[in-house]
UniProtKB/Swiss-Prot annotation:
Membership in a protein family: Belongs to the PsbJ family.
Task of the protein: One of the components of the core complex of photosystem II (PSII). PSII is a light-driven water:plastoquinone oxidoreductase that uses light energy to abstract electrons from H(2)O, generating O(2) and a proton gradient subsequently used for ATP formation. It consists of a core antenna complex that captures photons, and an electron transfer chain that converts photonic excitation into a charge separation.
Keyword Transcription: no
Subunit details: PSII is composed of 1 copy each of membrane proteins PsbA, PsbB, PsbC, PsbD, PsbE, PsbF, PsbH, PsbI, PsbJ, PsbK, PsbL, PsbM, PsbT, PsbX, PsbY, PsbZ, Psb30/Ycf12, at least 3 peripheral proteins of the oxygen-evolving complex and a large number of cofactors. It forms dimeric complexes.
Gene that this sequence comes from: psbJ
Tree of life domain: Eukaryota
SUPFAM superfamilies reported for this sequence: Photosystem II reaction center protein J, PsbJ (SSF161021)
Disulfide pairings: none
Transmembrane regions: 8-28
Gene Ontology CC terms: chloroplast thylakoid membrane; photosystem II reaction center
Protein name, per record: Photosystem II reaction center protein J
Entry-linked Gene3D superfamilies: 6.10.250.2070
């Protein structure tokens, strides 16, 4: 294992990034489905 002292583990970054991407896509499609997507 590389020295990760004081650094955020890569898997945590990947997990958080994945959740954010899924969340943004979900909000985008929900907004478009609700007719609010055009306001974005």
């Amino acid at each position: 294992m590389a020295d990760t002292t004081g650094r955020i583990p890569l898997w945590i970054i990947g997990t958080v990034a994945g959740i954010l991407v899924i969340g943004l896509i979900g909000i985008f499609f929900y907004g478009a489905y609700s007719g609010l997507g055009s306001s974005l």
